[in-house]
Amino acid sequence: MKKINTFFVSFIIVILFIGCSQDSNKDLGYLEVENIEDIRKLNNLNYVDIEEIKSLADSIFTTTNIMFSKKGIKNQVREISPIRTKENKSSIYIVNYENGGFFIMPADKRIFPILAYSNDNNFDLNTKEIPPFLIEWLQNQNSYIADLQQGKIKDSVDFSKHWNANFIENYIAGVKQSKLTARGTYGNSPELIYRNGPLTITEWGQGEGYNNMAPNLNCLSQSNGRALTGCVATAMAQIMKFHNHPNSYNWSIMPNKKNGNSNTNSGGFNEISKLMRDAGNSVNMNYGCENSGAITSHVANALKSSFSYKSAIYTEHDILSKIENEIKNGYPVILRGGEEFIFNGQSIYTGGHAWVCDGYQEVMIEICIKVGRWGYDCHDKIVPSYYMNFGWDGLWNGWYLSPFKGDYGTFDYKNGIIYNIRK
């Protein structure tokens, strides 16, 4: 049994400081992950067991005509990792594929079948790397689904008809229905209303190849001994690469990502390292081997004063509407999120992270709410999702349901956004 736990967070009693740790150091308590599950199917029509997930997973990402046509290959499920509740019931399944791609699916048909997905990247469950705020996101969903399974939440929405491979493939592929389709008659077919993104093409990280000009602290975790760049600097750098501004950098030689054959000391990676060093210095980065942190609210002024951007604004209000407006206008944003710990009556902000959001989509589905004993009231519902680039070499990048509000799973403490970034 593999656990995501055993580590303890060093508390940071500050309000706005973002420390982006390579080691999550988060005690998850009962949040457990396994690769094999052998439990009896519960006497509950809403419960989704691992065999049903496996059947769906084997059908969805494994054809050449849906998600992997651009690769021209068929894909295979690498592993299915259930996350369990305190009662030892599966609440969430994380499905990873051999050639890239993942799903995060709930174990209950009263919830929309796809909580997050990517057709390229994997959702790595390595406890030494997974960011604390993503663990918090999983915990929040785990708690919500556990309450739903125990009857603590009287949720009467029925998503069961959406739990099939055809619906999920159409949802991911972004199928647009005929304009003549009457409202409310979509049935099992989702309709893509809007999609834009991901806008950036970089999948940069914080380690070797990006930290070539960070302070040399003799870090054992890095072969070059240098500190991590920090998630704030990595997010800033990816945004500036999107704009190719300012012109004091050679943008054309910067590689979009690192792979096993990359020369991390090449001119291109050194140019990225220069950019990330300058970004870190502009926000007074506090460098470390496992954690390099800075204050995200300083990013907007740094972009204007140090990198000659005409505008950039930081706020903690109306974040979702600002994400949607910016991406619809063709601009990515930087987000901040973390988790709250109450200690001795004080609110402590810990496990923070800054990352890029550069995609937004809306899909129309039909949902049915139970009315009385036998009846259902069916109507249309918009399901929004957001593309997240977390700044860890592509790990965990993908489309997520609403990150800041909703019934299940949020990065919902000390939220912030840097938007209106214009050169």
Name the predicted role of every residue range:
Residues 1, 13-42:
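Bacterial Sec-dependent N-terminal signal peptides
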